[in-house]
């Protein structure tokens, strides 16, 4: 009889342990790190279509709490701004772009080059000149200017305007697929 009771307790403890691990994994995914995949070519050459990445979700919340902003050139994942949800984007979808402007910055595109506060921005990840012009834009308070690395084929701030910082979900941390490209996503 005691061996049956012992087996039941052991089985019960195993289930409790498994449940605890599942809850920890869900909590980590919900609050700390989340896997995502790249659905479009807007971040080529940095990220390719179908790449799998991990995003870190704590920093944007800490930044907002202490009224800080992401670093320039950080690759961020965010909920679509209102203008995109009004034309059919789901509130549950996510976009990925690079931060090129912070609140108070003046952003401009002239002769295929991006300028921030009157200075040309050096961007070694951009493979071709920008195929559009954009007069000087002032980035509003609590907003960011975000652009895809594939600037001529990206639905980004140059089309829909500044991104509210409250829309940030996380920052790109590392690529885990394909295996030959596994590693951190670096920012100069």
Put a short name on every predicted segment.
Residues 59, 158-160, 170-188:
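Extracytoplasmic/periplasmic terminal helices and flexible tails
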Residues 145:
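PRPP/pyrophosphate-binding module of the type I phosphoribosyltransferase fold
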Residues 12-15, 21, 25-138:
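Feature for secretory/organellar precursors and membrane-associated catalytic proteins
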Residues 148:
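Phosphate/adenylate-binding glycine loop and adjacent helical scaffold
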Residues 1-11:
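N-terminal Lys/Arg-rich, disordered targeting/topogenic segments
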Residues 62, 153-154:
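Active-site environment of divalent metal-dependent phosphoester hydrolases
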